[in-house]
Amino acid sequence: MKIDKEDDQQQQMRRVAFFAVAVSTAAVISSIVTLPMIYSYVQSFQSHLIMETEFCKTRARDMWVEMQVLHKSGVTRSRRDAGYKEGSGSGGSGSGGYGGPTGAGADIGPTCCPCQQGPAGPPGPAGDTGPNGNDGHHGAPGVPGKEGSILSSALPPSEPCIICPPGPQGAVGQQGPKGPPGPKGKSQERAADGKNGEPGMIGPPGPPGGVGEPGPPGPAGQPGRVIQVNGAAGPAGPRGVKGPPGPKGLPGIAGLTEIGGQGPPGDAGGPGPVGGQGPPGPQGPQGPPGDEGSCDHCPEPRTPPGY
């Protein structure tokens, strides 16, 4: 049988089939490599998210417990005298775009926060006075002034001044205002420490620590002692192993000479030997006709392309 050469359409279809198989193979290989990586990343992200969620829950529970402890203790905090903006009901905005702190006059309604944390408390008391700042640098020299000139007096000429004797001393004037602080001294001695502040409140108990390392082995104990105690009798033990047969007994008394009656039937005998082969049986009836034959098992005939 003569096979014709492939035409252009068949060659084009072959190229398309080869390209499709190559793309499918590459997609399968990339999915085999990419899916485990994506699964590992998602699993690690889920584990990290669960850890962060548990940590957030723990911190929120600790803060809630601390708020309850502070509420039960009844500790009040006073507002600071300076350094904070006066509070208002709406919370005004401060410099830089940040809201000012809420004062005691703020109207805080009963709200429920998802993080179980209340609003910010009032400002604390004023801190200690800070140390004096360093002296500033000297300023630049000023511009020289204009030259003065003698002007004629606009007042009429006065009588010649008569030198009078000094009068009595006047009364003592009021004390003047306090002058500015002087420059920083050059003494190398350290100033005295300030007084200690009041002790703070006891914080909540910290989280339990990790399991410590096992300690060194302890000293050896004293050797044991056997103490004899006469207790009650225990239960009977299990039955022992059967012993060996005893010695042969003495000969018995001679039997009677009379004939006894018929004894009981004996045990059944064993199976007999296999019997010989029997004669052949008669011929059986004729069987039904078989199925018609088919060509399913035959290979397909080879035909030229395009047939």
Swiss-Prot record:
Ranges of Pro residues composition bias in the record: 157-168, 202-220, 279-288
Bias-annotated ranges (Gly residues): 86-102, 258-278
Disulfide bonds: none
Region span, Triple-helical region: 89-105, 118-150, 167-187, 194-226, 231-257, 260-295
Record's compositionally biased regions (Low complexity): 231-242
GO annotation, cellular component aspect: collagen trimer
Matches recorded under InterPro entries: Col_cuticle_N, Collagen
Keywords: Collagen, Cuticle, Disulfide bond, Repeat
GO molecular function annotations of the record: structural constituent of cuticle
Residue spans of biased composition, Basic and acidic residues class: 186-196
Region span, Disordered: 76-102, 116-307
Keyword Disulfide bond included in the entry's annotation: yes
Entry superkingdom: Eukaryota
Similarity comment text for this entry: Belongs to the cuticular collagen family.
Record text on subunit structure and interactions: Collagen polypeptide chains are complexed within the cuticle by disulfide bonds and other types of covalent cross-links.
Function description: Nematode cuticles are composed largely of collagen-like proteins. The cuticle functions both as an exoskeleton and as a barrier to protect the worm from its environment.
Identification of the protein by name: Cuticle collagen 36
Organism whose genome encodes this protein: Caenorhabditis elegans
Gene it is expressed from: col-36
